[in-house]
Structures are given as structure tokens and as C-alpha cells.
Curated annotation (Swiss-Prot):
Residues annotated to bind Mo-bis(molybdopterin guanine dinucleotide): F258, S259, K260, P261, G262, R263
Any single GO BP term: Mo-molybdopterin cofactor biosynthetic process
Protein keywords: Cytoplasm, Molybdenum cofactor biosynthesis
Gene behind this protein: fdhD
InterPro entries on file: Cytidine_deaminase-like, FdhD
Alphabetical list of HAMAP family matching this protein: FdhD
Protein's organism: Yersinia pseudotuberculosis serotype O:3 (strain YPIII)
Protein name stated in the entry: Sulfur carrier protein FdhD
Main location class: cytoplasm
């Protein structure tokens, strides 16, 4: 399998996922100049030769994305269910070819659904409303987080957003330990993709104690993905939706929104928060 490493802050000359383009800057006078824009390309996830989904994503950390998506969608239960990941750039996008174990591929074929172009919609391609909610084993109560350490994590979040710092155009997802130290993270133009990338990286790291921190709002799908990968606490910089709160309550996940320096809103299972 492709090696997955935690993201690091890079110089602008090294940054993947951003390009400079000619623009016309308008203030009082029109002035031609160059500006950085985040890249957004179609990425097809292909399992054992069969295309499963095409999503718009920033073309970096794609092996982590493939692993995290496979885990958070319940296609696999552990990284060992994937034998290989191969990334193939093409003229119209990127193919990520994932070789599944025969048992997992058989399961995928049974539940396979047509899902195309899902950048922010978890309902696309689902035939029945009941299929929106995947069965999730209720999380145990083994984690705790002191909100005094949240400020430390928030101050470090931009470290995993080199493209975002250049363009102002990406979401971030990071894993923070109970002391608020940011252990690793990812960015993407899509908030769900950024989270999947993080979950893929976490699956290859010994990170158990801690929480997920995202720079976006918390939708039901963000909650579902987090819980599917066994994380017990999700901090969102913005708000949560009503459905996100319902799903978090049901699966025993502690959901925290409006995570800002010195304050936060705890929506569900506050016993994990000190």
C-alpha cells in the first residue's frame, strides 16, 4: 500500500494542490497580477477495477483519502483489507485504484450504489431514506478532553493548511491529543474529503487518545464518518446541524460546535468534556 505520512507545513514552492494564475485585481485601478488558487479535480475511486464514486478533491494525500473513505463508508473495517493503492493521473482527472480483499469486495458489490460528484452531499445516489444512516456500533466512553487545551489546538490548525494559507480556499481536519497538541491533519476544498484524508492518516498512526478538529460546520455525514472510525469527540469550528446532533446522540459521539478560543458549544454527551 502507498505509504501515508502526516501532512506538514511546506514552503509555497513545494506546495501541491495550488497553482498560480493570472488575474485582474480590482481596487481603485485594475492591475494584472498572479494569484494562488486551490486545485479542484475529479478523483475516481476504483475498487478492484470497478468505479465506485467520483468526487471533487484537491490532488494531494489521495492515498490517505482512499483509505479514510473506505473506512468511514464501511467498505473496509481495517487497513489490512486493502492490498494496494495506485494513483493514476489522467487528462480529465485522477484515478485511485484500490485493491480490496475478495471478502470486502464481495460485500461492496452487494451494497454498491451509484454515487457521482459527491462534494458536499451524502444523499446523492441513495435510493431510500433509510439507507442514509449506516449502522454504527455505539461508541464507548473512554475519552475525555479539557476545553482549556482547545485554544492550543485551534492556534495550530493552519499548520496543516499550506494551500489554505495561500488561497483561503480549503477546509482542514486534524487529530489533536488530550493536551491540545496537533498530531497531524489534512486539507481539501471539500470538508468531507479533508476528514476522510485525516481518518486515513490516523488509521496508520498510533493515535488513540484525542479528538477530531475540523475547520468547517458539522453535518450528519461528518459525525457518521467520525464515529465509523471510532473517534469519540468531534470539534467543529462552525455550527452543527440538527441531523448531526441526532446522529451524534444516537452513536454516543460528543459533538462540539462553535469551537473558538475560550468558548465552545457542547451538543451531545458532555460527560467527556472537562
Amino acid at each position: 500500500m502507498s505509504q501515508i505520512k502526516p501532512s506538514r507545513l511546506s514552503s509555497s514552492a513545494e506546495i501541491r494542490g495550488a497553482r498560480q494564475l493570472d488575474v485582474l485585481q480590482r481596487h481603485k485601478l485594475a492591475e494584472p497580477q498572479q494569484d494562488w488558487l486551490a486545485e479542484e479535480v475529479p478523483v475516481a475511486l476504483v475498487y478492484n477495477g470497478i468505479s465506485h464514486v467520483v468526487m471533487m478533491a484537491t490532488p494531494k494525500d489521495l492515498a490517505a483519502f482512499a483509505l479514510g473513505f473506505s473506512l468511514s463508508e464501511g467498505i473496509i473495517s481495517s487497513p489490512q483489507d486493502i492490498y494496494a493503492i495506485e494513483i493514476t493521473p489522467g487528462c480529465n482527472g485522477i484515478e485511485v485504484n484500490i485493491e480490496l480483499s475478495s471478502r470486502r469486495f464481495a460485500g461492496l458489490k452487494e451494497r454498491r450504489r451509484a454515487m457521482a460528484g459527491r462534494t458536499g452531499c451524502g444523499v446523492c445516489g441513495i435510493e431510500q431514506l433509510d439507507d442514509i444512516f449506516r449502522p454504527i456500533t455505539p461508541l464507548p466512553f473512554t475519552q475525555a478532553f479539557n476545553l482549556e487545551h482547545l485554544d492550543t489546538a485551534l492556534a495550530q490548525l493552519k499548520q496543516v493548511q499550506p494551500v489554505g494559507q495561500l488561497t483561503g480556499c480549503t477546509h482542514a481536519a486534524a487529530w489533536i491529543n488530550p493536551e491540545g497538541e496537533l498530531l497531524g491533519g489534512c486539507e481539501d476544498v471539500g470538508r468531507h474529503v479533508a476528514l476522510d484524508k485525516l481518518l486515513g492518516i490516523r488509521a496508520k498512526q498510533p493515535w488513540q487518545q484525542g479528538a477530531v478538529l475540523v475547520s468547517s460546520r458539522a453535518s450528519y455525514e461528518m459525525v457518521q464518518k467520525t464515529a465509523m472510525c471510532g473517534a469519540e469527540i468531534l470539534f467543529a469550528v462552525s455550527a452543527a446541524t440538527t441531523l448531526a446532533v441526532e446522529v451524534a446522540e444516537r452513536c454516543n459521539l460528543t459533538l462540539v460546535g462553535f469551537s473558538k478560543p475560550g468558548r465552545a458549544t457542547v451538543y451531545t454527551h458532555p460527560q467527556r468534556i472537562k
